Amino acid sequence: MYHIISIRDFERSDLDYLLDRAQEFDTGKYRPGMLDDKLVALLFFEPSTRTRMSFATAMARLGGRSISVDSVEASSIVKGETLADTIRVVSGYADAIVLRHPKEGAARLASEFATVPVINAGDGAGQHPSQTLLDLYTIRQSMPVDGIDVGLLGDLRYGRTAHSLALALSLYGVTLHTIAPVGLEMPANIALELRERGMEVVEHPNVEEAIRELDVLYVTRIQRERFPDSASYYNVASSYRITTDLLDGVKERLMILHPLPRAGEIDPAVDRTPYARYFEQARNGVPIRMALLHEVMK
């Protein structure tokens, strides 16, 4: 059985294969109704717009159907049911499970109890592999991924999208530039793992120092829901912002990406520049998730 839990589970060849498959789906090279007898369960115990809707859209475009739980309050977890029992039960209803959960490691746990494939749609501050695939796909549409300079800006401590993407980029000989507010730096264990994988990781005190070196700037929001209290959040909430003035002198091919939603860290005026690619990035979630759903249920 094929689970999609962590980027650590993939070789580069696996990622390239899925990206190639997504390209085929994106260009219409697939048979309608490929999953017309299949059903996916979307279990989202944290808020989601893009991930949940793009999985549902992907399944519909493949001819399949989806059922969903959109909050803890709408599930039997409020009655004391364990995640393991929930997964056991839902495995009897669907051909695959897409899970988002606030606890890191929840998707791995779910895969141990599921009798159908599990796709991790985000587990706390852990991993978000389908987001990473669409990030890579978006980059690859404009430039080869090998050997480029990528900057990660924002909440690198709690940001699962940053963790997943950094690990994936380590397979492509990328130089990684990290820019984070004090206290939100990349966790030491992940930074060490990246360097052990042979990745060059360069830390910068601010985005101004790094931005002219970059081919890709990946911006993330400060995640209020991960902070222990409001005071800690507000201490760093407005510590960086991408504006059009900041883009003077950057590389012509610079791409600005963001997993969305944003919360003020990118000025809306940037949307009108050729560097802004985050809405295209969001759109790419559909072909990527079509490829993933087909792969686990074919």
From Swiss-Prot:
Binding site residues for carbamoyl phosphate: R50, T51, R100, H128, Q131, L260, P261
Gene (name only): pyrB
EC number(s) recorded for this UniProt protein: 2.1.3.2
Pathway: Pyrimidine metabolism; UMP biosynthesis via de novo pathway; (S)-dihydroorotate from bicarbonate: step 2/3
Enzyme class, first EC level, given as a word: transferase
Gene3D superfamilies: Aspartate/ornithine carbamoyltransferase (3.40.50.1370)
Protein name per the record: Aspartate carbamoyltransferase catalytic subunit
InterPro entries registered for this protein in UniProt: Asp/Orn_carbamoyltranf_P-bd (IPR006132), Asp/Orn_carbamoylTrfase (IPR006130), Asp/Orn_carbamoylTrfase_sf (IPR036901), Asp_carbamoyltransf (IPR002082), Asp_carbamoyltransf_Asp/Orn-bd (IPR006131)
Function (record text): Catalyzes the condensation of carbamoyl phosphate and aspartate to form carbamoyl aspartate and inorganic phosphate, the committed step in the de novo pyrimidine nucleotide biosynthesis pathway.
PROSITE patterns: CARBAMOYLTRANSFERASE (PS00097)
Similarity comment: Belongs to the aspartate/ornithine carbamoyltransferase superfamily. ATCase family.
Reactions catalysed: carbamoyl phosphate + L-aspartate = N-carbamoyl-L-aspartate + phosphate + H(+)
